Amino acid sequence: MPELPEAERARRQLERVVGREIVAVDDADTYVCRPHAPGEMAAALVGHRLSDTHRRGKFLWAETDGGPGLGLHLGMAGSLTVDEEPAPRNWDRFVLEFDGGGRLALRDKRRLGRAVLDPDFSHVGPDAAEVGREEFRARVGRGTAPLKARLLDQTVISGVGNLLADEILWRARLGPRRVPNQLDTAELDRLRRSTRAAMRDAIRLGGAHTGHLIPHRVRGGRCPRCRTALERATIGGRTTFWCPACQL
């Protein structure tokens, strides 16, 4: 599932088409382009150019030169492709075509991505890679749900998925079942530093799957730091691995 690093890679793809005039739009997939009717996005975007790109957590959007904003979400398995041949089996769910040739496509085999005009991100928490110290303390250090579930809540901070949550907690030496409102300030600050470091490393190395813990998230896996057998459970509805010796 795409997490913040994959979304940042997609934003950089989107950046490649800034300044190119849109001459055609394929918005026929009524599920991916909901709530827009077929042709509505095309009518709003044709003749405009993307002028800037942004990301908050897993959510992407682009400004246009006088037209509406364009919001994109990769869903569970989507990606953005630029100037590639059309995908087989109609997996290109939303497509922009540009003057002089070339195309941007939301490619999504599972059809869980989104394309929408003028997206509303008021329900989305601050970007996990950029949230400040005081705001992180106030948002994450609340509530009694397991700490991992708190990190996964996109209204609290945005961009942390299942793999990154395990990696962040392992780096911070905090157990996934810890109660957020019982963490002290030093623990919350350590968690924020671990979050930012894990995000930076994952963006640099190419995705959430590159974390130190991730290759060991298997049955029988051992902690790469102390070699203790990892524990495995479902926490917050997600499969979770952690070190019972390091993560307290």
Regions picked out by a protein language model, each given a short descriptive name:
Residues 1-248:
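Structured catalytic/nucleic-acid-binding cores of DNA maintenance enzymes
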